[in-house]
Amino acid sequence: MKKAYRLKSRLAFQSVYAQGRSVANRAAVVHVLKQQAGTPTRVGFAAGRKLGKAVVRNRAKRRLREAVRLLWPRVRQGYYIVVIARQAALDMPFPELRQKVEELFERAGLLQREG
């Protein structure tokens, strides 16, 4: 994912948590905050310490990052998104994880209609 689309600052993450809405399933939690029109959508990834040591947390984030990358052409513009990994994100096969992330983005209203 390009640098321009990454959400990295602590302040940005905190504002998404505080002011945004969230949807969740077994694999992940997605927090979404709408921005002004014309703002590019930015996405950040997180994994709590409860998930495991750094290697495990990084693996969970890599898997989620790839699932989001595959969805990226369909994601609407003008949002800040934070995706938080859950334990199931590590345990399930990647095609299932990709489907779960797509369901979350759909429920959050982040995907454009195809066609």
Swiss-Prot record:
Disulphide connectivity of cysteines: none
Coiled coil spans: none
Assembly and interaction partners: Consists of a catalytic RNA component (M1 or rnpB) and a protein subunit.
Highest taxon above the source species: Bacteria
Biological processes per GO annotation: tRNA 5'-leader removal
Organism: Symbiobacterium thermophilum (strain DSM 24528 / JCM 14929 / IAM 14863 / T)
Upper lineage: Bacteria, Bacillati, Bacillota, Clostridia, Eubacteriales
EC number(s) from the headed UniProt entry: 3.1.26.5
Reaction(s) the record says it catalyses: Endonucleolytic cleavage of RNA, removing 5'-extranucleotides from tRNA precursor
Segments passing through the bilayer: none
Keywords, ordered alphabetically: Endonuclease, Hydrolase, Nuclease, RNA-binding, tRNA processing
GO molecular function: 3'-tRNA processing endoribonuclease activity; ribonuclease P activity; tRNA binding
NCBIfam families reported in the protein's UniProt record: rnpA (TIGR00188)
EC supergroup of this enzyme: hydrolase
This protein's name: Ribonuclease P protein component
Cellular compartments per GO CC: ribonuclease P complex
Pfam families: Ribonuclease_P
Name of the gene encoding the protein in the UniProt record: rnpA
